[in-house]
């Protein structure tokens, strides 16, 4: 049996002043799963995203990506692991307006192992996967909100990551575009991509096959049947 795409073991994250943003969180996400992590504002979702994505280190416990314990890695190795195995999608897109859709997607390949001559081909392939094959040369500011988020998703998947972390991916979109983005994430998952959606919206969470709930930094529910405790 293959290792989980992502595993957290007794993870805690404390901030100065004794504020516990996460407390004893344990979970495992298997390859090709589609998972919602849901909670209200202040529940610890953003901190959990940062810890899962190795953007922040836990105060206690361990984070394993594809079976690799991140505690054993130095900063350079951790950055390399993140770039090779994790794709991020953020609510605010994080695109560069002066660049085309293709160029924005190519930025994800600048520091990886993809040869320069292959980067444009990889970017175009990713944009075709998200339905933007006709928008390759459009600059980011010329795209609609839904199209901009599709570019962001293409950038997240262009490295063929083990895991995609989507933080409130519909938060800046209207209902129709938000529905289209969720349909796209579900399609990518059906093609084998492991997707974790972080959201405050229970309607979004309820449409996904597995739901993990956070409250005050604790994992309090997991629809997979895994133990949850406060």
Language model segments and positions:
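ABC-family P-loop ATPase nucleotide-binding domain
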Residues: 1-13, 221-230
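ABC family nucleotide-binding domain
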Residues: 4-214
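H-loop (His-switch) and adjacent beta-strand-loop-beta switch element
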Residues: 211-224
């Amino acid at each position: 049996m293959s290792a989980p795409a992502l595993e957290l073991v007794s993870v805690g994250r404390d901030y100065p002043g004794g504020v516990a943003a996460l407390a004893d969180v344990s979970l495992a996400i298997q390859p090709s799963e589609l998972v919602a992590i849901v909670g209200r504002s202040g529940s610890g979702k953003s901190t959990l995203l940062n810890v899962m994505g190795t953007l922040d280190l836990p105060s206690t416990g361990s984070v394993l990506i594809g079976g690799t314990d991140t505690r054993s890695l130095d900063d350079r190795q951790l950055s390399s692991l993140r770039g090779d195995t994790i794709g991020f999608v953020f609510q605010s897109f994080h695109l560069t307006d002066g660049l085309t859709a293709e160029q924005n997607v190519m930025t994800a390949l600048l520091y990886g192992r993809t040869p320069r001559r292959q980067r444009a081909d990889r970017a175009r392939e990713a944009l075709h996967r998200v339905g933007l094959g006709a928008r390759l040369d459009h600059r980011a500011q010329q795209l609609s909100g839904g199209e901009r988020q599709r570019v962001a998703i293409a950038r997240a998947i262009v490295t063929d990551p083990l895991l995609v972390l989507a933080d409130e991916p519909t938060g800046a979109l209207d209902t129709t575009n938000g529905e289209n983005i969720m349909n796209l994430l579900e399609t990518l998952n059906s093609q084998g991509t492991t997707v974790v959606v972080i959201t405050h919206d229970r309607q979004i969470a309820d449409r996904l096959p597995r739901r993990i709930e956070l409250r005050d930094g604790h994992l309090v529910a997991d629809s997979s049947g895994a133990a949850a405790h406060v």
